[in-house]
Amino acid sequence: MTDRYPSPRALLDRYDLRAKKSWGQNFLGEEAVLDDIARLAAPRAGDPVLELGAGLGHLTARLLARGARVVAVERDRDMARVLRGELGDRITLLEADAARLDHAALAARFGAPAAAGEGARLAVVGNLPYHLTSPILFSILDQVAHVSRAVFLLQREVAERLAAPPASRDWGLLSVLLQREAEVSVERIVPPGAFWPPPKVESAVLCALFRPPADAVGDPARFRRLVKAGFGLRRKTLRNALGSAKLAEPARLEAAFAAAGVDPGRRGETLTLAEWAALDRALG
């Protein structure tokens, strides 16, 4: 790290702490990766950024150096103590669960309008433990109108699944839901040695730039149920998978397949985003 901010090991020693394995704590200390994440999350000075799981504050410090206005979320009281001690009132610190945030309220308080007539939004950034990735992503997707972009450090295999192309082996529920709302890309691979303590797997930086959905659906909540059902029984055909989920009467399902131009003998992972959206509209 730089002279301005101590290394992860130095901070843990200073505060007599250890990384908590049960919390998935692996602290990123590689300068180049921190700089890339901060640049992606806060391209302009003054940008409001919500950092999920701020930890020891290494990314927080980089965001501040870029002139970002940082709202740091940290549930671990030990980490919150470090953040207060090292960064003080330069940040707004919230001791809260990152998967249970009210993004509308946070955006209204700290966010910036995306364009004339649009509501306030925040960029969201964080180094997400594996076990919290899905809950946090679903929380963001439920409140996507209040998020401008998301930049996450994830396990490499998770990041690659989220950015997977349609009809590929890694194409799944979260791939469909996230890519409907955002342009998604894997920006760089991060080796275990960039962290302390080093994890056993590679990580990757994922960037999601939120924009109006490219494919309209009849009912967003039903769309999620539809896609979940289609991927829930991957070995079954769409006719059987959606029929088992009882999303509609069999005759209505058959009519929807015909109207959407989707062969009910296909499997869910073979459908593109546009085909999923067309099937949802046909069910409406």
Curated annotation (Swiss-Prot):
Gene Ontology terms for molecular function: 16S rRNA (adenine(1518)-N(6)/adenine(1519)-N(6))-dimethyltransferase activity; RNA binding
Recorded GO CC terms: cytosol
UniProt EC number: 2.1.1.182
Keyword Cytoplasm applies: yes
InterPro entries assigned: KsgA/Erm, rRNA_Ade_diMease-like_C, rRNA_Ade_Mease_Trfase_CS, rRNA_Ade_methylase_Trfase_N, rRNA_adenine_dimethylase, SAM-dependent_MTases_sf
Annotated positions binding S-adenosyl-L-methionine: 26, 28, 53, 74, 97, 127
Family from the record: Belongs to the class I-like SAM-binding methyltransferase superfamily. rRNA adenine N(6)-methyltransferase family. RsmA subfamily.
Protein name: Ribosomal RNA small subunit methyltransferase A
